[in-house]
Amino acid sequence: MEQVNELKEKGNKALSAGNIDDALQCYSEAIKLDPQNHVLYSNRSAAYAKKGDYQKAYEDGCKTVDLKPDWGKGYSRKAAALEFLNRFEEAKQTYEEGLKHEANNPQLKEGLQNMEARLAERKFMNPFNMPNLYQKLESDPRTKTLLADPTYRELIEQLRNKPSDLGTKLQDPRIMTTLSVLLGVDLGSMDEEEEVATPPPPPPPKKETKPEPMEEDLPENKKQALREKELGNEAYKKKDFDTALKHYDKAKDLDPTNMTYITNQAAVYFEKGDYGQCRELCEKAIEVGRENREDYRQIAKAYARIGNSYFKEEKYKDAIHFYNKSLAEHRTPDVLKKCQQAEKILKEQERLAYINPDLALEEKNKGNECFQKGDYPQAMKHYTEAIKRNPKDAKLYSNRAACYTKLLEFQLALKDCEECIQLEPTFIKGYTRKAAALEAMKDYTKAMDVYQKALDLDSNCKEAADGYQRCVMAQYNRHDSPEDVKRRAMADPEVQQIMSDPAMRLILEQMQKDPQALSEHLKNPVIAQKIQKLMDVGLIAIR
């Protein structure tokens, strides 16, 4: 086991120094000695990814997940490899699977957000550039009539030449119709799972269903039941709940197969604040509805009302359960929004209930012990648990940042340092650990800035002074060739993602041909951020 740890540490140092082949050899030798060690496969996956051998990185990521299915890092490795292989949908699914095991893993959360953004970009690539554009518009009756309007043609040409204007034109119903034709989808139904309600699409052609019976076709008992229901509705609107209940009760007796009269009674008890009786009636209504093959939308309403009753009582777990039952019957934006609201409240309640500074201290001490032994993955787990128990303790983020740095996860180390500094701006370790991570990434300019901030707080801080001096010397002795700059930059996953984005490649080519285009692109904050990143790593320069 000692030999395995030595090989692993040797591999980590080689990978940090950019000696990828040496790192791969060390990890492979360690795996031969300990083939069930998931951390070794995870590290080798990272090395293969840096080398550009994404298929092998993916295979090692899969092996990591197989050996340790509850470890978020394994899913992160596997998903990252899938990203590089341009298998975005699979990458998204892998991030989602990882979050089932580690719901608060920041790397998985960020990865999932990036994948959703990438998939959204793919989904809405400029369709106005297709070669047979007008032929397609002519062949569809929805757009054929629009082509007679010169302003419509002008609009199409504008979007063809400047697709960035599409976002400002989506309010125009002609554009939504055009997109439906060009993309071959009904955009009215695409947002079914969005939180916010959207205007419903045009009704589809009616199916051959039995027509709703008119009152004159109904049996006498059903007619009387409807009249009682109307009287009940009038009383309900006037807040005369006792009278409303009497009429709904008569309607139910006249037509016992109709669940609506029972759900109306439940609505009255809901307004009266008798939530137990409301739920009992809703359950009874669902039973009657099932027996008589009632419309699933009515069943969904009954479940939603049960959910609302629990929400009123602040029993959010029960509310979520019944909201989901309602959504399984029939999905509506209002119920979805209410369910998400309950989930958000419950999550916050659970987070606050979990806070315990004494247990946080215990976990911190366990983390310190593991860190001293060199078991950084286990130390990180203890620090993460400590943070959940006491999220306002800046030192915990600093300790976890030290773990991330040891595990070569410099971006995550930087995030924890930022959180540490935000919580306690005068805590020196937050600055020195952030600077150390930047130094390890060979970003000497930024590292010097952070070391200087530490010295501003404490001019006698030897760690900051030594670090600053190291960065000055490293910067002075640096004679990187363009190839070295590119190799180091491409080892950064964020840079890899930017450079593999077809849209960004197009923008960079356009900037080379037409430098004036830069100012236009910089108006988009997302693109500006990506360009700034490429400038920071030295891949591009603007004069």
Swiss-Prot record:
Residues with PTM N-acetylmethionine: M1
Residue segments, region Disordered: 191-233
Cellular-component GO terms for this entry: dynein axonemal particle; nucleus
Chief localisation class: cytoplasm
Example GO molecular function: Hsp90 protein binding
Residues annotated with Phosphothreonine modification: T198, T332
SUPFAM superfamilies to which the protein is assigned, alphabetical: TPR-like (SSF48452)
Start-end of Basic and acidic residues biased regions: 205-233
Keywords annotated in UniProt: Acetylation, Cytoplasm, Isopeptide bond, Nucleus, Phosphoprotein, Repeat, TPR repeat, Ubl conjugation
N6-acetyllysine: residues carrying this PTM: K8, K301, K312, K325, K344, K446
UniProt entry tagged with the keyword Repeat: yes
Renumbered ranges of motif Bipartite nuclear localization signal: 222-239
Phosphotyrosine sites (modified residues): Y354
Record note on domains: The TPR 1 repeat interacts with the C-terminal of HSC70. The TPR 4, 5 and 6 repeats (also called TPR2A domain) and TPR 7, 8 and 9 repeats (also called TPR2B domain) interact with HSP90.
Protein name (database record): Stress-induced-phosphoprotein 1
Source species taxonomy: Eukaryota, Metazoa, Chordata, Craniata, Vertebrata
Name of the gene: STIP1
